[in-house]
A protein has these predicted regions:
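Short, small-residue-enriched loops and turns at beta-alpha junctions
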Residues: 29-30, 51-57, 86-88, 108
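Single conserved hydrophobic/aromatic residue that forms the stacking wall/gate
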Residues: 1-13
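Generic structural signal for well-ordered alpha-helices
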Residues: 33, 64-68, 90, 122-129
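Anionic-ligand binding region
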Residues: 14-44, 54-70
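Glycine-rich phosphate-binding active-site loops on the catalytic face of alpha/beta enzymes
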Residues: 7, 48-54, 96-115
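Hydrophobic faces of well-ordered beta-strands that scaffold small-molecule active sites
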Residues: 21-24, 44-46, 78-82, 100-102
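Catalytic cores of alpha/beta
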Residues: 28-38, 80, 84-100
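C-terminal helical cap(s) of enzyme catalytic domains, especially alpha/beta-barrels
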Residues: 108-133
């Protein structure tokens, strides 16, 4: 009941403000992935691995299988995030899905460079963008 109530509340907020609810799919069973994909709107955020968000040296989750199940159940775009920090990782994720999501790496640049961060972030984002073209 709690989940149903929360979902109903989210739908009311979505409808009131005209926004999409972005579904997150973590590594889980095919049935659960299919269920979430069928209800998805906007885009699907695929969580690349379980644990705390942040920079990872490698991602070992079978993301191809997750994307395959999503594609079998919806045409809503999906992007992979959670630990993506290098241009090589971004390219790999964009090759598998519709895009790569980067958050923590940008926050680290902001924390490290303060007022000078926009230049560093701009260069970083350009390198990521160039990698996925």
């Amino acid at each position: 009941l709690h989940t149903a109530y929360r979902r109903q509340r989210q739908m009311c907020i979505r409808d009131r403000y005209g926004v999409d609810l972005i579904s997150l799919i973590a590594p889980t069973s095919k049935n659960r992935i299919a269920m979430i994909a069928k209800e998805a709107e906007g885009f699907i955020y695929i969580v690349s691995s379980l644990g705390v968000t942040g920079v990872r040296s490698e991602i070992k989750t079978d993301l191809d299988s997750i994307v395959k199940v999503i594609r079998e159940n919806t045409d809503v775009p999906c992007a992979i995030g959670f630990g993506i920090s290098t241009p090589e990782q971004a390219k790999k994720m964009a090759d598998i899905s519709d895009g790569a999501i980067v958050g923590s790496a940008i926050i680290k640049l902001l924390e490290k460079h303060g007022k000078e961060a926009p230049d560093y972030i701009g260069e970083y984002v350009r390198s990521m963008k160039n990698a996925i073209r």
